[in-house]
Amino acid sequence: MDTFDSARESLEGYLRRIGCLNDRYRRGEIHVHVPAGLDEDAPIDDLVRRCLPDSARALDAASRSLFYSLPVAFDPAHSVGPYLATVDRDPEGEPYRFLDMGAMIATQAFGENDPRVVEALLRDLPYVTSRFAHSEYQTALSLRLKAALDRVAPKGTPRHFVVNTGAEAVENAIKAVLLNRVKTSGEASGGSIVSFEGAFHGRTLGSLAVTHRKKARLGFPTFDWPHVSFPAVDGTPRESARREERSLKQVWDLIASVRMPRAEQRRESFQRELEAIDGFLAAPGGDLDAFVRAQREALGEEPLRRARRVAAVLVEPIQGEGGVHFTSAGFMRRLRVLTRIYDVPLLFDEVQTGWGATGRLWAHEMFDLPAPPDAVIWAKKAQNGVLFVSEELATFFQEEKKFNTTWEGDSVGMVRLLAVLDRLDLDQVARTGEHARAGLEAFARDYAGLIHGVRGAGVMLGFDVVRGDWRDALRERAFRLGLVLLPAGERTLRFYPRYDTEPYVIDEAVGLLRRAIEDLIRGRNEPAVAAGPEIRVGTLECPIEAIEAVELTPARFAELESQIVAVEAERYGDASQYPPDVLRAGRRPLLQFPSAVLAGTLSNPGALGLALRDRVSGRVVAYALGSALEGHDEEGVSADPRLGENDTFYLHALATLPSIKNQVEVENLLLTRIRDQALAGSFSHLSTLIEERVHRTGPEWLRNAQVLQVVDDYLRSGIRFVYLHTEIDGAGAPVVVERRRTRR
């Protein structure tokens, strides 16, 4: 037998199979196919062992691997479009299939086993049988890719550097702007890089310095660089405008003084510059270079010299990992002019958004910037990492091989990208995105108590689930039904169809979402809105003088966890409060916080917690905990007028045993103690989403708190919650906000 006979036979079978699969997919004959038992109320790992045994064996064989997320083994050879086959087969020999609405973490523009990609890989097989070290050994393939990148390079950033991953591209962008400062301004350290809260730029050490995701950063020493608030478009236009101005002021403070002041600093100077920028942007056809020169002359040499200590501002056009958050075009235009005036490079991280995902070739094109960015970072759909830079930043790339990397990209990824680079159809992206968004908006309308905030551009879509633990539960239920979704931020689910996804596939995905959420609320009758759970006649005597307060540190919480969870369960998870079918095995109670959520809050910046314990019995009878407002994304937080000011304590969780006779008295003691704790922790304001009953029966300072939002039927529990805000230091003018009422 010829050496290649077996391979040739296998290849021919594969080509016949994918040809047939693609035909069936385009005819609408491929659908989700998962074992019926996968939806039983049992731990998912147990169900995988029972229903997907081949996947379980493959995972067991790789048990020393440090990380995997989805508990199945996929089979690329039998996958098609967004339908991912598993290695497991049904009794008829057909593979089980999951529907991927994560686009392989935003890496795939087109479907699995796309015929044109397969054809390209076969044609360029010689280039992928050996991996050339392109830093020294260029090939016709690597040079063909670099020539192709010239065609898609963003305006103003014609030079490019191919690396292996998005994080590596971010690292090289960081190095480029730091070296630029060292060489051009004599700033020995290279200065600092300003990034935004909610940002995610990678997990390598340098990229962690510009990432604002506590779980990714925790435990790693890195650069102490500043983060400013990201003015996500949310709430009223007035509120969005206030956030934008606050964020620009923070950037301006850093550029002008290289520190983040708590007090207002030279606000009149900032307002004067901002008014000048707005005036320029309002006049069509303005000469940006002339405007920048005039502003620099007015500023003088000293402010411009100080600004050199900021090496760059780095921003995502859309925060993907951070929660599919957008800001306005007006904010980005102002930011671009501000950074030009102070000669601070502006970098766009388009790792997720680049090459068509938003309906534009590059997402920053949505903003109609008065000047292009100084660098654009791309990866994901590039199948490698790519850094595009301006001619100015490219100056030092050849110096002493400071930017060298052995591989300069992976050949297989190069072939994949070249196969689809000229297939981008932005009209197709728009059509696919519009169909998906319409389906999600209808879904959100039908489940307005649980789902809201559908948003996106192109096929980069997301929606919020009312609480983070519900988001996780919904994602798991969807997975059991065969739908793969990826989380983002604190309570967002991403919905990323591929560019050429067939309409029937999107309809199927939305249908599975509907089934999944019905699983979470199945069996419930719509209850009448009540003021709160009925307070039962208590049997436990708990005199105030017999109560001791215990500060809840993470370690102390671990010691008292079982008692705290018992209080939470009796208050919000007991069958006397909810229909029994809601509490059957494998379901999460409607209002009860899982212990992992409570522990997570105590790991936040500014975390405070308190438990009240009966000295006689030693039993915890009440607890409360929370942290800085900026660490939360619950209902009402995004519209809080103090968000971004870093002076507000958010009371995240509070529960008192409903079985004690003097429940309200104990509750009020707890509320006052936690308020005092927050005041001692340098917080001047307190916000919380809390039962309306507690607002009515709480201590005077809470009864006088301003109601910012009324949430009827919270989590379809029949309980009315209110979002409260109050000043706790007794100083300052009252906050003026627009009161909202929603049915959640």
Describe each model-derived feature in a short phrase.
Residues 691-718:
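Conserved active-site alpha-helix within GNAT-family acetyltransferase domains
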Residues 1-534:
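Conserved N-terminal phosphate-binding loop of PLP-dependent enzymes in the Aspartate aminotransferase
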Residues 615-653, 715:
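Conserved acyl-donor/pantetheine-binding loop and adjacent beta-alpha core of acyl/acetyltransferases
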Residues 530-574, 740-744:
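Conserved N-terminal entry element of GNAT/NAT acetyltransferase domains
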Residues 678-693:
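Conserved GNAT acetyl-CoA-binding A-motif
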Residues 653-656, 662-678:
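Conserved acetyl-CoA-binding loop-helix of GNAT-fold acetyltransferases
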Residues 568-616, 625, 631:
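Active-site rim helix/loop that mediates acceptor-substrate recognition in acyltransferases
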